[in-house]
Amino acid sequence: MPAKPVLYLIDGSSQMYRAFHAPVRTGEGSLLRNAQGLPTNAVYIFVTMLRKLLKEHAPQYIAASFDLPGRTFRDDLAADYKANRAPMPGDLAAQIPLVHRACEALGVPIVTQERYEADDVIGTLTVRALAKGFDVAIVTGDKDFFQLVDDRVRVFNPRDDGTWYDAVGVKEKFGVAPEQVVDVLALMGDTIDNVKGVPGIGEKGARDLISTHGTLDALLANAAQVPQKKYREALLNHADEARSSRELLRIHTDIAVDIDVATLNYRGPSREDCYRLFSEMGFRTLVNEYAPDARNTASDYALITTS
């Protein structure tokens, strides 16, 4: 029986952010920049990651998703959602359109949706892909995506020694089954996104409570019987915060994205677009590889074929 096709879905925003903060510097310790002074470190690391993924995994189907500027439905649910986040560094903001260009030049389509985050786009594409007979690989370092893992959905973290997480891996890494992840996150909260959670309950406590009670709803229904006084009082006093936090942290899988996953087949890079972009960035090795007179090699992913 032939293997199912696999759709690779790249969490572009988180990968770009991690690329920006990766230790890629010039000899003087400053950010990598091109000849015009434009920062290029996030572009360089993102491109390196993406090219490695394309070369080593040869995906037949692939897409990337990025957060869009502006409000999302989560801002409507909680006015202070992400209120603690510092403004995006200007050196990162300047690289966003360049990372988008890199995806397009390398042949990776970008899928986004107004008022939703990349997480929800990826969640929706995942469910659609499963319905069409695909398996799914989510490329991210964000533990929130563990909630989507099942026997046909895995998470691949290119920064974590290229680790794959299936349901067993999620349990080993996070301490609970994938379907329990969002309940643990709801108790913990998220300081970066200003999701409150339940005060006084950290990751270990959240894991233990959900492991014992199975679900957040069951835990809250039996909060008065929780033996630890600290947890019992916190759950009784902050049940609404736990539920609202779960709604903020749950990845939506049914949003109105106008795309057929079957059209996300990988067609390879545009050598001309790659050459132009990498020349602007000053990535000399890549410029040489995609130069008009360069010979096609095994690293030219346009040669990938499907049967």
Functional labels for PLM-detected ranges:
Residues P2-V139, K143-V168, E241-D258, T263:
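Noncatalytic, basic helical substrate-engagement surface that gates or grips nucleic-acid strands
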Residues V111-V121, Y290-S307:
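Charged, flexible boundary elements
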Residues P23-T26, A79, P87, E272, ...:
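A generic structural signal for solvent-exposed, polar alpha-helical segments
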Residues M1-K4, A58-A63, D150-R154, P158, ...:
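Non-catalytic nucleic-acid-binding/docking modules located in mid-to-C-terminal regions
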